[in-house]
Design a protein with these regions (language model features):
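Divalent-metal (Mg2+/Mn2+/Ca2+)-assisted nucleotide/phosphate chemistry catalytic cores
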Residues: 131-256
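Positively charged, low-complexity intrinsically disordered leader regions
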Residues: 36-78
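Intrinsically disordered, low-complexity polyampholyte segments enriched for Lys and acidic residues
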Residues: 2, 19-21
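Short, positively charged and aromatic/hydrophobic N-terminal segments
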Residues: 13, 23, 31-38
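N-terminal catalytic cores of NTP/NDP-binding nucleotidyl/phosphoryl-transfer enzymes
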Residues: 61-123, 228-234, 240
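Conserved nucleotide- and phosphate/pyrophosphate-binding catalytic cores
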Residues: 243-432
Length: 432
């Protein structure tokens, strides 16, 4: 896909001409930062780095901002996302929100969808080799990313550019040889995850060793001034500086953000671990999953998601409800948040059924309904998940839990009955 085109320009009351030239003009009505309060590159840099884990090299961001102001151009601020799953989750929004802050100061975001690097899979933090995705899976996931990213980013074409790294990584062998000459195997094995796997005798594929070089070449291709990423990306982001230098380009500044723990409060949020909240999930799902968060992880979520903490002394349960409402409001609206809270209270506090339950048509054979097949169809899950939930007592018919042996039930016991799958999913079954 070609990059979005557009130029910054115009004026803004209360700012000098140099600031207007460097930062552009916020669209009317947007909640933009007052540039008059950000008159110096040093104060801009301090603001942007205030909740970051690291800004590397020291003083580099302020220097980049000074250079951009002198040249009368916005910074090119890069973030790469590999479409290894169809949904952007809350963990991604920590760095997306930082990108938005750069946009609000008039800079240009370059969002790179890693359709090519996703074929390899980022090995950062991995103790094994990632499974390979098909081209169809990667393409389907990639198509959802831009729309989801706009839930956080400003879609103004003057402040936003979308690129797919397949544009430049589908390179000739001669170009690949030039890229690989920029880095040594010893450098790559300095990475903690590679070093650990190498010491343990675990396999490391050549493709995985190439991944940091491919990510670094992205910075060459888009001429990035600043790159953002999680703290698990520090090695890759710094390596990109070396690669840019080898190609005769100015080295980017690196800004790393803390990693948001998942709903378990321990591990990094990811779909693989099943502890994620997707930003397109239904309000009721968002609210309910947030309420599962351990109390000791709440402050981290409030801070990293840039949500105001409740007053000191607020009871943990009330603080968590406030957190859940704020998350749903951000990605839906206040009315949806109120409805999600009412749904949660009705189902999990008052133990009543939801106000609205969708019907699902299911099939029967010889007078029996085979639950694994019927519920898989009704809820859009796998039969193995239905069997697992049956064994765990996680399937209820009209409030009565079923067991692992309840695989085939008479039509009379199922038709018109409300089935609950897990904690928050309900359907009324209608036998065809």
């Amino acid at each position: 896909m070609k990059a979005a085109a557009g130029a910054l320009g115009g004026g803004m009351p209360g700012t000098c001409a140099a600031e207007r030239k460097a930062y552009g003009t916020p669209a009317p009505g947007r909640q933009t930062l007052a540039l008059g309060r950000m008159a110096s590159a040093g104060s801009d840099a301090a603001f942007l780095a205030r909740n970051a884990a690291e800004s590397l090299p020291a003083g580099g961001l302020a220097h980049k901002l000074e250079q951009a102001a002198q040249a009368g151009r916005p910074l090119r601020v890069k973030l790469g996302l590999d479409p290894t799953a169809p949904d952007i989750h809350l963990g991604h929004t920590v760095v997306l929100q930082k990108l938005r802050e750069f946009q609000d100061l008039g800079h240009r975001v370059v969002l790179i969808v890693g359709d090519y690097t996703a074929r390899v899979g980022d090995p950062s933090g991995r103790s094994d080799t990632r499974p390979v995705l098909t081209g169809e899976e990667i393409g389907a996931n990639a198509r959802t990313y831009e729309q989801q990213a706009f839930k956080v980013l400003d879609a103004d074409p003057g402040r936003y550019e979308l690129r797919f790294n397949g544009e430049w990584l589908d390179m000739r062998m001669e170009e690949l040889f030039r890229l690989t000459r920029t880095t040594t195997v010893a450098q790559l094995l300095d990475r903690e995850d590679f070093a650990t796997r190498y010491a343990a005798g675990a396999p490391i594929s050549i493709l995985e060793l190439l991944y940091p070089l491919m990510q670094g070449y992205d910075s060459v291709a888009v001429r990035s001034d600043v790159e953002l990423g999680g703290t698990d990306q520090t090695f890759n982001l710094l390596l990109a500086r070396d690669i840019q230098r080898h190609y005769g380009l100015p080295e980017q500044t690196v800004l790393t953000l803390p990693i948001l723990p998942g709903t378990d409060g321990v591990d990094k949020m990811s779909k693989t671990r099943g502890n994620q909240i997707g930003i397109t999930e239904a309000p009721e799902e968002m609210f309910g999953k947030t309420m599962r968060l351990p109390d000791d992880a709440m402050d981290t979520w409030f801070d990293l998601l840039a949500l105001g903490r409740p007053p000191a002394g607020t009871a943990p349960r009330d603080a968590k409800r406030a957190l859940a409402r704020a998350i749903v409001t951000r990605f839906h609206d206040a009315a949806a948040a109120a409805g999600a809270q009412a749904h949660f209270d009705r189902v999990f506090v008052e133990h009543e059924l939801p106000a609205e339950i969708d019907d699902s048509a299911i099939d029967a054979r010889d007078g029996l309904v085979h639950l694994p097949a019927a519920l898989a169809s009704a809820f859009g899950v796998s039969r193995s998940e239905v069997r697992r939930l049956l064994a765990q007592g996680g399937v209820k018919l009209d409030g009565e839990p079923l067991g692992a042996g309840d695989l085939d039930l008479p039509i009379a016991r199922v038709h018109g009955v409300v089935v609950q799958l897990g904690r928050r999913r309900f359907r009324r079954l209608q036998v065809r």
